[in-house]
Curated annotation (Swiss-Prot):
UniProt-recorded name of the protein: Inner membrane protein pE248R
Family: Belongs to the asfivirus E248R family.
Bilayer topology: Single-pass type II membrane protein
The protein's assembly and partners: Interacts with A151R.
Localization, UniProt: Host membrane; Virion membrane
Main localization (coarse): host cell
Keyword Membrane applies: yes
Keyword annotations of the record: Capsid inner membrane protein, Host membrane, Lipoprotein, Membrane, Myristate, Signal-anchor, Transmembrane, Transmembrane helix, Virion
Leader sequence segment: none
GO CC term (a single one): host cell membrane
Organism annotation: African swine fever virus (isolate Tick/South Africa/Pretoriuskop Pr4/1996) (ASFV)
TM spans (from-to): 200-220
Length: 248
């Protein structure tokens, strides 16, 4: 963790968010033949390496219901942070329990900026049809690709200010924590030791206060017991003096 830099880019964060949204919506997306369309008209046309990557059918009512579920944003933020970890982007857990870690910062960023309406709109954009039409004679079409997958969600996110704010915030958060751990490994260790030492000192103070309390209670009870013994001894002494006086 220390001594190595793990910079996260805006593009990488955008891809992670779009992939996470796509994965969260898997139950609403099904494969459907014939959704994309390639039309070739004429004679002598040559097509090489023409691909249709993904044919999709989207259940929009399922999408609407899914994004409005109470735990949707939480599940989405969990998947985004997990994807960041899987791509070896440093996610530092801070030693001080009172400080927000990256995961908390990312969750707050998503909840504020990545609205369910935006997510629903971007997922719904998957239902568009890709069309490739070639007309005439003697045309050569090579390396033509029709993509209808996470890239569409990614393009949609890049067209939204809220999504851009989310992506920028997550990218900066990851890089900020990564910079902290990589800038000076010994500073990180020193902070960790300081946090542990601080906790030990607090525990020691509590123990000392408990011991002082026990001593105070013991002293109070002991003094009270001696006082009671002295009060009981005074009548006995007086009676003894009276008896000696009578004998005399």
């Amino acid at each position: 963790m220390g001594g190595s830099t793990s910079k996260n880019s805006f593009k990488n964060t955008t891809n992670i968010i779009s992939n996470s949204i796509f994965n969260q919506m898997q139950s609403c997306i099904s494969m459907l033949d014939g959704k994309n369309y390639i039309g070739v008209f004429g004679d002598g046309n040559i097509l090489n390496h023409v691909f249709q990557d993904l044919n999709l059918s989207l259940n929009t009512s399922c999408v609407q219901k899914h994004v409005n579920e109470e735990n949707f944003i939480t599940n989405l933020s969990n998947q985004i942070t997990q994807n960041l970890k899987d791509q070896e982007v440093a996610l530092t857990q801070w030693m001080d329990a009172g400080t927000h870690d990256q995961k908390t910062d990312i969750e707050e960023n998503i909840k504020v900026n990545l609205t369910t309406t935006l997510i629903q709109n971007c997922v719904s954009s998957l239902s568009g049809m890709n069309v490739l039409v070639v007309k005439g004679n003697g045309n050569i079409v090579e390396n033509a690709t029709q993509k209808q997958s996470q890239q569409i969600i990614s393009n949609c996110l890049q067209g939204s200010k809220q999504a851009i704010d989310t992506t920028t915030g997550i990218t900066n958060t990851v890089n900020q924590y990564s910079h902290y751990t990589s800038k000076n490994f010994f500073d990180f260790i020193a902070d960790a030791i300081s946090a542990v030492f601080k906790n030990i000192m607090v525990a020691a103070v509590v123990i000392v206060l408990i011991i002082v309390g026990f001593i105070a209670v013991f002293y109070f009870l002991h003094s009270r017991h001696r006082h009671e013994e002295e009060e009981e001894a005074e009548p006995l002494i007086s009676n003894k003096v009276l008896k000696n006086a009578a004998v005399s």
